[in-house]
Amino acid sequence: MAGPGARKSNASNTPQDKKMKGDSIQDQKNKQYNSGDVVEPFVSDAMAKNSKQLLYAHIYNYLVHNQHHDTAKKFLQEANVPLSKAVPQHSLNGDKLLNSKMLMNSPDTFLFEWWQSLWALNQYVETTPIENLTSLKPFNDRIVPILPQVPPQEMLSRVVRTGPIAPAMGFAGNIVPQQQQQQQQQQQQQLQQQQQQQQHFRTMTSPGSGNTPYATNANSFPAGVRVPQPQGSFQPVLGTTPNAGTNAGLGVNPYHAATLGSSKSTPKPQNTSVGSKNKQTKKSSATNKDSGANTKPRANGESKQFKGVNSSSKVKKPSPSGSQQVQANWTKLQQKQQQQQQQQQQQQQQQQQQQQQQQQHQQQQQHQQQQQHQQQQQHQQQQQQIRMQYQKMMTLMQHQQNQQNQQHHQLGNQNILPGQGDPSDNSSPSQQYLQQQRAYENMVKSQQQDQPMNKDHFAMSLQTQQPQSFDSYAMPATMGPQASSQPLDNNKKSEPLSKIDVTNNQDFNTFSGGSNNKLNFGQFDMSGLGNEFMGGRKQ
């Protein structure tokens, strides 16, 4: 049987009851949007079952708020938007819009506000120079954890309340100077963190087994405990192991206030000793001597340690904390992005240079082609000019040759004697005369063959004469004037007929001793030749 002090089990504290209570609370929240009075369903983020439906609800609310009605209808039909009550999918045919009631909402919709905040953060990171981000003070200063602190007055009051501890260290009711208080306040935060890390090293041992030179009292560690130095980034400072001096000057550790409170109820070392009073007095005097002997070297050691702390704080820096590592990673990422951007810019510049070189090469080729085309045109023009000049020269040469031929023809015609015509003209009377003369010679030859015995002096003279060329100016002795032995000058004009002695010429119709009737020249009428060839040339 259970006693009267036994508790009765509360049915409301069971897990099942808690779950039912949570469901009822959720139902109460949804009732304000899913009441029975509302006939048509509506879109609400309170009915979202997962993050995707929550996003769909806010997207739909954003579209309706900004009057994108067609897009909202299509989105309501295609997306799984959370509704206040179950509706068949075929009923959402895209003809009507549903109202939206959102728990998380704002004047410009929650989706827009959320995106605006992200965009502002992104713009700040993009527009702020990297130097300003890396030179922020919180990332470079020493980070000291914020711990509960005890005001100096309370610490002094606690020190005074300890009783025999203060006179043992020589602080008999004296006030600590201000300089020491400032130094103690600066070191208090470091001591609190170190003491928190050293809690697992604090164990109780026998008083005689320790080698530490520090004095012991009711509020200090046991003499046998050696406190190791912390392995953190902070430098060792005075008072790593609490003792009478530290308790007197720095106050009571706030984490061990309970031990101090319990020390009042616990018997003091003088009351707990079992031996005689003499032994107790000897022991107390020994402890006082040890404490007095230890105060002097510790004072010197404190000054040295303070110097070491100040110097080390200037030289050594704390190890990077989590925020510094994040900042370092951020700077590395920014540097990588800058390097990538620089590489991309270099690649773009190289591509632009290549394109410019290609364009220059194409322009040079086009210029060369134009020059070649111009040279070809010039060459063709020169050839045409040369041909035209050659044709002109040929025409001039032909014209000059024709003129020379005409002049030569004229000069040759001037040297023709009277009675001779132009030898090139076959139709002239002179040519007819020569033909008649040849016909006559042929006739004479035929008569000589028929009558060899009948000799004719005129015929004999004709046979002895050689045929002369048309250009010869010598006349036979029997015809006209006798030829002289001197050669005729071609450039010399023929003498006029007035100077010719006509008396020496014989009549062609009457010859002496001509007995043959065929030799009568009456049939060759040459009376008209005198007028045509009187000047040696056809008029």
From Swiss-Prot:
Its main location: cytoplasm. It is found in: Cytoplasm; Nucleus. InterPro entries: LisH. GO terms for cellular component: cytoplasm; nucleus. Disulfide bonds: none annotated. Residues 178-199, 307-323, 398-415 have a biased composition (Low complexity). Residues 16-30 have a biased composition (Basic and acidic residues). The keyword Transport does not apply. Residues 200-220, 230-246, 260-294, 423-452, 501-517 have a biased composition (Polar residues). Pfam families: LisH (PF08513). GO terms for biological process: regulation of biosynthetic process. PROSITE patterns: LISH. Belongs to the MSS11 family. Transcription factor that regulates pseudohyphal differentiation, invasive growth, floculation, adhesion and starch metabolism in response to nutrient availability. This is Transcription activator MSS11.
